[in-house]
C-alpha cells in the first residue's frame, strides 16, 4: 500500500472537486490498511465530480461522508466442531452499508481472503449496483474466513458436508438477530451456494421460529426462484449485448474469453454459446482450460459436474478438445479474441493483461466478478474507448433476480422460467440505458464506469437528502 500522503496527491491529480478530494483524504487516512475498500471508493468518487458540481445539495448534506461509512458493521465469532471433535473458531462479518432505498441486500462469502476491507468494498459497490437495478434494495455484504475447500484436519481434502452444515449453523446463530426480510436479506456469493444457503436458512427458521424470505438463492422446493443461479452470468452477457448494439454489432461469431468456473462464469459461457459466440476458456485457481474449437455443451456440463458435484479443480480434469495450462489466467493464454468476461475475483486482470488484450484487438470487456480489473487495467480500457462495463452494472443480474425472488416470496407465488428471464432481460437493458444516458448527460458518452456510478449514486443520494440526517 503506497504512503498515505502519496495516495492523497495521486487522488488530487485525478479529481477536480475539492469536496471529493477532502472526502478521499479523510477516507484514506481512516482506512489506510483497507486497500480494496479504498480502491472501490476512489473509483466511484473520482467519477462523480460532474454531478456533484451540478447538485450542491449533496455536499451541503454531507452525502459522500455518510455514504463511505457503513451504517453498521457486525463482527462475531463462529465456533464449530469438526469431524474429529476438535473445536474450530472462525470470524464472521456483516457490513450493513446503506439502507436509504431499501433493506440491506448482498451476498455472503466464505473464503480465507475475507476480511473487513474486502467486505466493505463489496458492500460499497453493492449500494450502487442495487440502486441500478431500480428495485428497492439497499447494500450490504458479509461472510467469513472459513474455507470449505480445505479440511482443517486432512490436508488436500475438503470439509465434509457435516462440517459445512455445523459451520453454517453456528454462523447463522451469530447473525440471525441482525437480519430479516424487511431489514437485511443475505444471499450466496463465493463458496456459498445452494447447499450452504439451505443450511443457513434451516438454522434461521429454527432460531426465529418463522418461515420468511430472509435469504435468497434458496432451493426451488422452499421458496427459491428459477433463473437465480444463472442470473449473474446471463445478465453479464445481456449487458454486453446491449453495449454491442450501440455500435450495430451482436455476439454472433465473437471469440470470447471467460475467467472463472463458478456459477457466474459457467452461465455466462452458456448464454454466450446460445447467442452464437465461441467460448475459448474457463479457469480456476489451478489454471486455465483452453477450448481450441470453442466450448461445447457437453464440455460445459462436465465442467459444472466437476465444480458443483465433485468439487474438484481443472488440474484433475482430463477432457478431449481442451488444453489445460497450469497456473495461468486466460488473458494472455489465448492470442486472438474479441470479448473478455472476467468472472473470477477482484483484481484478477492487471495492467499488463490489459496491454496484451488491447494489442491483440479485444473490443469488449464485461465484468462478471466484482472489481476484477485493477485501476491500471480499467483506465487502459477507458482510455482506449473499449466497450467496458463495470461489475456494479454488468453483474447486477444476480441481485436483480434476488429482488425478484423476494417479490415472489412476499406474494407467495412462483414465476415461470420464461417470466423471470424476461424480467432479467428488461432490468439489464434498463441498467445499460440508464448508465449510457447518465454518461452522455455529463459529457462522458460511452464511459459506462462514469455512467453507472452517477446513475447509481443519484438515486441513493436523493433518498438520503429526503430522509434527513440519519
Sequence positions of predicted segments:
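Structural signal for hydrophobic packing residues in well-ordered secondary-structure cores
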Residues: 27-31, 45-52, 56, 123-131, ...
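General beta-strand structural signal in soluble alpha/beta enzymes
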Residues: 121, 183-187, 211-215, 281-284, ...
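Glycine-rich phosphate/diphosphate-binding loop of Rossmann-like nucleotide-binding domains
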Residues: 216-219, 224-336
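Rossmann-like adenosine-cofactor binding region
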Residues: 287-388, 393
Amino acid at each position: 500500500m503506497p504512503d498515505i500522503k502519496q495516495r492523497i496527491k495521486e487522488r488530487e491529480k485525478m479529481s477536480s472537486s475539492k469536496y471529493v478530494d477532502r472526502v478521499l483524504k479523510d477516507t484514506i487516512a481512516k482506512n489506510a490498511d483497507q486497500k480494496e475498500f479504498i480502491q472501490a471508493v476512489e473509483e466511484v468518487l473520482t467519477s462523480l465530480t460532474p454531478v456533484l458540481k451540478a447538485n450542491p445539495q449533496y455536499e451541503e448534506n454531507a452525502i459522500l461522508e455518510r455514504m463511505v461509512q457503513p451504517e453498521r458493521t457486525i463482527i462475531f465469532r463462529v465456533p464449530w466442531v469438526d469431524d474429529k471433535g476438535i473445536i474450530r473458531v472462525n470470524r464472521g462479518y456483516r457490513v450493513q452499508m446503506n439502507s436509504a432505498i431499501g433493506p440491506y441486500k448482498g451476498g455472503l462469502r466464505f473464503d480465507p481472503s475475507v476480511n473487513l476491507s474486502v467486505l466493505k468494498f463489496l458492500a460499497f459497490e453493492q449500494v450502487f449496483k442495487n440502486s441500478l437495478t431500480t428495485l428497492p434494495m439497499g447494500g450490504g455484504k458479509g461472510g467469513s474466513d472459513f474455507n470449505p475447500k480445505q479440511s482443517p484436519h486432512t490436508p488436500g481434502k475438503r470439509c465434509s458436508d457435516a462440517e459445512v452444515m455445523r459451520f453454517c449453523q453456528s454462523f447463522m446463530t451469530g447473525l440471525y438477530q441482525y437480519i430479516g426480510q424487511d431489514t437485511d436479506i443475505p444471499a450466496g456469493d463465493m463458496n456459498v451456494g445452494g447447499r450452504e444457503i439451505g443450511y443457513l436458512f434451516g438454522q434461521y427458521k429454527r432460531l426465529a421460529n418463522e418461515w420468511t424470505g430472509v435469504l435468497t438463492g434458496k432451493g426451488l422446493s422452499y421458496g427459491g426462484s428459477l433463473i437465480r443461479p444463472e442470473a449473474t452470468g446471463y445478465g453479464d452477457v445481456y449487458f454486453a449485448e446491449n453495449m454491442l448494439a450501440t455500435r450495430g454489432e451482436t455476439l454472433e461469431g465473437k471469440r470470447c474469453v471467460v475467467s472463472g468456473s463458478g456459477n457466474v462464469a459457467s452461465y455466462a459461457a452458456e448464454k454466450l454459446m446460445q447467442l452464437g459466440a465461441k467460448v475459448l476458456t474457463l479457469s480456476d485457481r489451478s489454471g486455465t482450460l483452453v477450448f481450441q474449437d470453442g466450448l461445447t455443451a457437453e464440455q460445459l456440463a462436465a465442467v459444472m459436474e466437476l465444480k458443483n458435484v465433485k468439487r474438484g479443480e481443472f488440474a484433475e480434469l482430463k477432457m478431449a478438445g481442451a488444453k489445460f495450462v497450469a497456473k495461468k489466467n486466460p488473458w494472455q493464454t489465448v492470442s486472438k479474441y474479441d470479448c473478455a468476461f472476467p468472472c473470477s475475483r477482484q483484481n484478477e486482470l492487471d495492467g499488463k493483461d490489459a496491454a496484451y488484450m488491447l494489442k491483440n484487438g479485444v473490443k469488449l470487456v464485461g465484468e462478471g466478478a466484482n472489481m476484477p480489473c485493477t485501476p491500471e487495467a480499467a483506465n487502459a480500457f477507458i482510455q482506449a474507448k473499449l466497450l467496458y462495463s463495470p461489475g456494479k452494472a454488468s453483474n447486477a443480474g444476480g441481485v436483480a433476480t434476488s429482488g425478484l425472488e423476494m417479490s415472489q416470496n412476499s406474494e407467495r407465488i412462483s414465476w415461470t422460467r420464461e417470466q423471470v428471464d424476461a424480467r432479467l432481460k428488461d432490468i439489464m437493458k434498463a441498467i445499460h440505458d440508464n448508465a449510457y444516458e447518465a454518461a452522455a448527460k455529463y459529457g462522458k458518452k460511452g464511459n459506462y464506469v462514469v455512467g453507472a456510478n452517477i446513475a447509481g449514486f443519484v438515486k441513493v443520494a436523493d433518498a438520503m437528502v429526503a430522509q434527513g440526517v440519519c
